[in-house]
Design a protein with these regions (language model features):
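Core catalytic region of metal-dependent phosphoesterases/phosphodiesterases
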Residues: 4-128
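His/acidic metal-ligating clusters that form di-metal
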Residues: 48, 95, 119-181
Length: 181
């Protein structure tokens, strides 16, 4: 697990944290207009930040379960679309982790799609190749204001894996996560 520390300005006392995951850009069922609207809504708020939690694209490889030809764009075109779609969030990304769709490409070809996207968006230093523990410091701690200390919040980030389509698998994954945190 990677530790990521984000120190926000002391004058920022309150933030919103939004999670974007499983949008599967390039999947025929992806609501790209809905994704773009959500990104615009987040970008319009001065105190809004985002966690990119994997499966931003719908990449398939020759050996993956999904059909490599069912996506609408090539892997490179999907990366470019992700960079364009999430560009308004540049400077607002607290953390980025890959999902299983990005990990497929890394395992097959050694190309880390999530890092490429995060780096292009100015958040390469806030990328974790697996799980991340993100410490976000902001505002001033009311009990330690005279010392100039900020209040720090911790956020555990992981795309998750497995579980499939059955409820039993999802329950087992939640039990696994309960052992971690």
């Amino acid at each position: 697990m990677h530790v990521i520390r984000v120190e926000l300005p002391k004058q920022q006392n309150e933030i919103e944290v939004h999670v974007i995951a499983d949008v599967h850009l390039s999947d025929p069922n992806c609501d790209i207009r809905g994704v773009q609207k959500r990104v615009a809504d987040i970008a319009a708020k001065d105190n809004a930040y985002v966690i990119l939690a994997g499966d931003l694209i719908d990449n398939a490889t020759r050996s993956s379960v999904g059909d490599i030809y069912s996506t609408q764009l090539s892997p490179m075109e999907q990366i470019q679309l992700a960079n364009k779609t999430f560009a308004p969030l540049k400077g607002r990304i607290l953390c980025a982790v890959p999902g299983n769709h990005e990990e497929r490409t890394y395992r097959a070809d050694g190309i880390d799609i999530t890092w490429l996207i995060a780096n292009e968006l100015g958040a390469g230093d806030r990328y974790a190749p697996d799980a991340a523990l993100v410490f976000v410091s902001l505002g001033e701690n009311s009990r330690r204001k005279s010392e100039g200390r900020q209040t720090t919040y911790s956020i555990y980030v992981n795309h998750g894996n497995g579980g499939g389509r059955k409820i039993g698998g999802k329950i087992n994954r939640l039990a696994d996560y309960a052992q971690i945190v």
